Amino acid sequence: MTNQDVVMPDIAAAAAMPGSSGRAPLFACRGAAAVSASSMLGGGGAAYQAAVVAHVAPVPAIRPCASWVVEAMRASSPTRPAAAAVDAEYDAWTQRKHPSALGSFEQVAAAASGKRVVVFLDYDGTLSPIVADPDMAFMSDEMRAAVRDVAEHFPAAIVTGRCVDKVQSFVGLPELYYAGSHGMDIKGPSSNEEEDTKILLQPAREFLPVINKAYKALMEKTKSTPGARVENNKFCLSVHFRCVDEKRWNPLAEQVKAVLRDYPELKLTQGRKVLEIRPSIMWDKGKAVEFLLKSLGFDDDRRDVLPVYIGDDRTDEDAFKVLRKRGQGLGILVSKCAKETDASYSLQDPAEKYTNAGAHVFVTMLLTVVFTAAVALALVNAVNSHDFAAHLAGVDCRMGLAGPVRCPASGFVELLVLALHVVRCVLAILDRLHACLMSPSLQLSIASPCHGVPCSIGAVEASAIIVSDAPEGLISTLTTDHIYYMTVFPAKLALTSEEV
C-alpha cells in the first residue's frame, strides 16, 4: 500500500494535479465472464505478456536515512484527530479540486455514456476498513454482494499490496481478476472457488528467494519492537507499525534499514502505517492496470473504454497517474482528509453502518444508473414516437383496456387518463429508485441479463412504455425484437429479457 515511484526523502510530497471530470459520453453491460483469462492471453496477449516481462528493468535502490523514514512515517500516518480547521480544509478540497463521486454522479454517468466500463478496486481501506490486525480486515457481506454484481456486468479487478491468496480468501469471488503484491502477481478468474486462478503475469518472480530471506531477517530483527508485525505478501514485504508506540518508530526504522543493507535488490517505500519492501523494478499498480487493460483488448487508443479505479493509498496514485496519462478514466480517492492526488474524484467514509460505505454506495450506484438511464431513455423515445397513442390505446396495460379505442371523442379522454396514470406510475417508481439509492442495505441482482443481447443504453429503441399497476411496479420496454422487464422493489432491482 505504497507508491513505488516515491522514494523516502520525497515521500511526503506527491504531484498535485487537480482532478479532471471528463464530460465525454451510459455503459455497455459487458460482464467479466465474457472475457476469460485464456482469451486475455490469446490474440496477442501472450506476446504482450512476454514483452512486458522483457522490459521490466531493475532500477537502482535508493537507501533513505532513518530520520527521513521516520519523518515520512509521521507525515503519512497522522496520529491526532482532525480539527475543525482540517474539516474546513477537506470541504474546500472536495469543492474545488476533487468533488465527491457520489455528489457528482451525474457527471460520472455522463463520462461513461456509450463506453465500456472496467472497474479496478483497492482492498484495504476501500473494500474493507483499516484495522489494527491485517488478518482481520474483512469486507462486509453487503460490499461483497455489490462487488459481485459489478463483476457480472463489467470486467473487474482487485489491485492490492496484499498477497493474491490472502485477498482472494477475503473477497471470496473467483470471477474477479486479482493483481496482488502491488500488481506483481496478476491472476485471472476461475470457474469456481476450488479451482486455482490462472497466472497471467509475475514480473518479479526471480526476486522470490531474496524476498524470503529478507522476510526471515526482518522477523528476527523487529521482534524486539512491541507491536511491529512483518507480513509476507509473496513479492513484497510489509512492516506494519500501526500498533507501535510512536517513540519506537525511529528504532524500528533503523532495524528495517539495517536489514536492507544486505539486500540491494530491494527498495523501501511506505504507506498508511506500513513500510513496504519491494523489488527494485519499474512495476507498480499503474503498470498492472495498463497490463490488464491491454490484455483485455483495451489499447491506449480505444476511446470507447472508461477505466474506473477506486483506492485510498499512495500506491493507488500510480494507477491514478496512468488514467490521467491515457486521457480517459476516472480515479477516485477514498480519503477523510485533504491530500495531493492525481484522482479526479473523492469518496469519504461516512460514519454509518459500514466504515467503507462510500465505496459501497458508489459501486452500487454504478450499476443502478444503467437501469435508470434505460428507463429514462425509453420514456423519451416513447414520447417522441408517432405510435405512442396507438400503443397506449391498443396494448393491455392491466388497467382494463383490452382493445383499441373506437370513439375519437372518448378516446382522447381515455388517453389523457392513461397518460396521467403513466406519469403517476413513473413518479412512484422513480421515488422507489431514490429510496433504494439512499438505503445502505441496497442490493442489486441481475437475472439472466439480456440473454446475450448487448445491453448498450444507446441500443434501446423503444416505441412504447407500458406501465402496469402491479404491486411490484413492472415496467416493460417494447423494442423491435425483445421486451425488457425491470422490476423495482424497495431494496432490489432485477432486469430480465425475453425474446418476442
Curated annotation (Swiss-Prot):
Pathway: Glycan biosynthesis; trehalose biosynthesis. It is an enzyme of class 3 (hydrolase). It catalyses: alpha,alpha-trehalose 6-phosphate + H2O = alpha,alpha-trehalose + phosphate. Pfam families: Trehalose_PPase (PF02358). GO terms for biological process: trehalose biosynthetic process. Keywords: Hydrolase, Stress response. One of its GO terms (molecular function) is trehalose-phosphatase activity. Its EC number is 3.1.3.12. SUPFAM superfamilies: HAD-like. Its cofactor is a divalent metal cation. Gene3D superfamilies: HAD superfamily/HAD-like, Trehalose-6-phosphate phosphatase related protein, domain 2. Removes the phosphate from trehalose 6-phosphate to produce free trehalose. Trehalose accumulation in plant may improve abiotic stress tolerance. Belongs to the trehalose phosphatase family. This is Probable trehalose-phosphate phosphatase 8. It comes from Oryza sativa subsp. japonica.
